[in-house]
Regions:
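Short solvent-exposed beta->alpha transition segments
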Residues: 48-82
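A mature extracytoplasmic/lumenal domain signature
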Residues: 51, 61-62, 87, 92, ...
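Short beta-strand edge/turn micro-motifs at domain boundaries
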Residues: 116-141
């Protein structure tokens, strides 16, 4: 009987450890896609649910914060985006670093911005929710 109780305790401890561990790659990738989709849809309220209020971004055109991201959202007419080559890494339970390629079709202020971009984000778990705190992307050279 003691043996079975020991196994039950070990199983319980293992399941607790898994539940507080960093999310898997698929869960973070879904959050990443949600951020892109809300940006594409110009859904500022939805965007703020997955991107932290203290967000920072680094792009070829400059440094960005939440206010600038929301302003830039209005200038975009994104037709589509496709994320590929997605990787996620963490050595902390509440931080994830991602890198990926994203193919975008659309315009910014009427100018074509379509292309393939190399991108990366940093996600932080705050109050049980995963929020993007940093993002960067640069157009890939052919």
């Amino acid at each position: 009987m003691k043996k079975y109780l020991a196994y039950a305790v070990i199983a319980l401890i293992a399941s607790i450890g898994i539940s507080i561990a960093a999310p898997d790659k698929d869960a973070i990738e879904a959050k990443e896609k949600e951020a892109w989709q809300t940006f594409k849809d110009k859904n500022a309220e939805g965007f703020k649910k997955v991107v932290d209020k203290d967000f920072r971004g680094a792009y070829a055109e400059g440094i960005s914060d939440m206010a600038k991201e929301l302003s830039d959202m209005k200038k975009w007419d994104m037709k589509s985006f496709t994320i590929s080559d997605y990787t996620a890494f963490s050595d902390e339970k509440d931080v994830m670093v991602t890198t990926y390629t994203v193919k975008v079709e659309g315009t910014v202020d009427g100018k074509d911005a379509s292309g393939t971009y190399n991108a990366g984000s940093v996600w932080k778990q705050e109050k049980g929710a995963w929020m993007a705190i940093f993002h960067t992307n640069v157009k890939a050279e052919k």
